[in-house]
Regions:
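Glycine-rich phosphate-binding loop of actin/hexokinase-like ATP-binding domains
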Residues: 153-173
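Nucleotide/phosphate-binding catalytic cleft detector across ATP-hydrolyzing
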Residues: 1-157
């Protein structure tokens, strides 16, 4: 893998100005599930960015095995004082804020090994270039081929690769 990646990257690094590198990750170690978080709205006023962060942290307070980590926290919707289906609660008034999320987890070692491989391959060609982030393969594919409207209306993305086929279903964003 290192050799193939190094050959591909060295060609592009020498021909193009590359500002960032995103690494896609997949495999049977990837898991996803729904989680909810809850927080009181500070001072019983308007929902702030800090309130959103508190709700997300509450949803992330889950028990994972030592070899797993959270890769993505994807917000689905929010509820304020029983009013549900809210996509953007920022600035709305209320007392209690609930958030529904889809969490994606993966093996720490798989992520670390991918990052090491990419760093080794790009390190010789450009000392200032570092991986920006590791992204679930299906999410990376969706960012390049789907519009926000398609994800909102609902779509099934099927990515047929050389060795695997990945499926991602988007509904309500």
């Amino acid at each position: 893998t290192n050799k193939i990646l190094q050959e591909s990257l060295s060609k592009y690094i020498s021909e193009e100005k590359i500002d960032s590198v995103y690494i896609s990750i997949s495999g049977n170690h990837i898991q996803s599930f729904n989680a909810t978080g809850r927080a009181a709205i500070a001072d019983n006023k308007e929902v702030s960015k800090q309130d959103l962060k508190s709700v997300e942290e509450s949803a992330k307070a889950i028990t994972l095995s030592n070899d797993q980590e959270i890769l993505h926290v994807l917000s689905k919707d929010y509820e304020i004082d029983g009013q549900d289906g809210i996509k953007v609660p920022l600035g709305m008034s209320g007392i209690a804020l609930d958030g529904r999320y889809h969490l994606v987890t993966g093996a720490k070692n798989a992520r670390d090994n991918l990052e090491k491989c990419v760093k080794k391959c790009i390190g010789s060609g450009n000392k200032n270039l570092e991986p920006t982030d590791v992204v679930l393969e299906q999410l990376a594919s969706s960012m390049s081929v789907l519009t926000e409207d398609e994800k909102e209306l609902g779509v099934c993305l099927v990515d047929i690769g050389g060795g695997t086929t990945d499926i991602a279903i988007f509904s309500n964003g």
